[in-house]
């Protein structure tokens, strides 16, 4: 692997000896010790067998030199959990042998060591077990091979204070017997029974398995406080790339006067914050598309439909229907009885829409507008009752009830208001007497919902539609003060 000219990389991932295919399951490979598998880092492991001794030594040596466990995991191609477990075990017991935490290598505590432990605890009652263990090593009372584990020291402290000598002796004897039983069934004991140890492994098991390397105990690090200049530098780099490589991180660390580890952690936290913000923005955009997703208080006020002063001429209606871009689409109205019962009245409404109720369908429907009449028009299109503003805007207080006169209205997408027209259509006045004969019909016959096709509520041409005759039934329902 070649590097850039003039740059000396700190950490280079070794190139694998062979390119393994990236599959969902680990690839099986043949090793001298048996059938192995390849982990996600490219390292070979044998399921059920502990990590080889030389790799355990390498892990402890790298940790002794201050290399982080995540870097050790990538360089040695060992899983992060395995590295952390070996280092934690070595810190607690001083051993890198497999199964040392479970008591597979029992260390019988001598009376002299127990007396020292009691003395340390008596002099300093707040001393922890791991501090007592470190003091035993520091004072030379024990070495790495004979020092008791942290759990053994804790058991000694629990048993020595408040119990008699006979109970102590019996407890020690029971612990020793249990330790011997556990040793036979430990991983190390089972592997020794299965495979005869070679002379090299026997030598290395007692000498090489215990590297006398002190590890720094992990201290809780205080949170890093970034200055404004450092944050500006980091944000500029984050705008360029969310995943900087090792060279970019080191260069950025030099410019911002930070360590490469701090830069790496900052980018990790910044990516998490960016993903959270992106998800929240997507959710907000999606909820704006669905008005019912949030209560009305969380949604902006929807603009109400307004009416213009200019009315459509009867001759222009067939052209508007034939031209899809100019077609006025009306949603299908609801029956008067159910709507009237479900909607509250609002006498202070200044503008409203009327749904002309024709006994002959849309053949007698008129495009006209209704002037405001105070308390007589209680419907407000802005009432949030579960219906869309378009449907509510087309409903009246007495929708469909006879003997309610109304004037012509025009529906236009242009901004305007509800004002009385200057003149009434001549066709309405000509057919007024003709419509008076229909007063005897019932209210249920007055509701005639229109038919719409499935493609965007476009009106279907029917035989009953006579566009030049629009306005023949409007004047019958006009109020006396308007007529």
Curated annotation (Swiss-Prot):
Composition-biased stretches (Acidic residues): 200-211
Entries under CDD domains matching the protein: homeodomain (cd00086), PAX (cd00131)
Induction per the UniProt record: By wnt-signaling from the posterior mesoderm.
Entry-linked SMART domains: HOX, PAX
GO MF annotation list: DNA-binding transcription factor activity, RNA polymerase II-specific; RNA polymerase II cis-regulatory region sequence-specific DNA binding
Localization (cell): Nucleus
DNA-binding region in chain numbering: 34-160, 219-278
BP GO annotations: fibroblast growth factor receptor signaling pathway; hatching gland development; nervous system development; neural crest cell fate commitment; neural crest formation; positive regulation of DNA-templated transcription; regulation of transcription by RNA polymerase II; Wnt signaling pathway
Record keywords: Developmental protein, Differentiation, DNA-binding, Homeobox, Neurogenesis, Nucleus, Paired box, Transcription, Transcription regulation, Wnt signaling pathway
Residue ranges that the Swiss-Prot or TrEMBL entry lists as coiled coil: none
Entries under SUPFAM superfamilies matching the protein: Homeodomain-like
Cited function: Probable transcription factor. Promotes both hatching gland and neural crest cell fates, two of the cell populations that arise from the neural plate border. Acts downstream of msx1 to induce the neural crest, cooperating with zic1 and mediating signals from both the wnt and fgf8 signaling pathways. Induction of hatching gland cell fate is independent of zic1.
Protein name: Paired box protein Pax-3-B
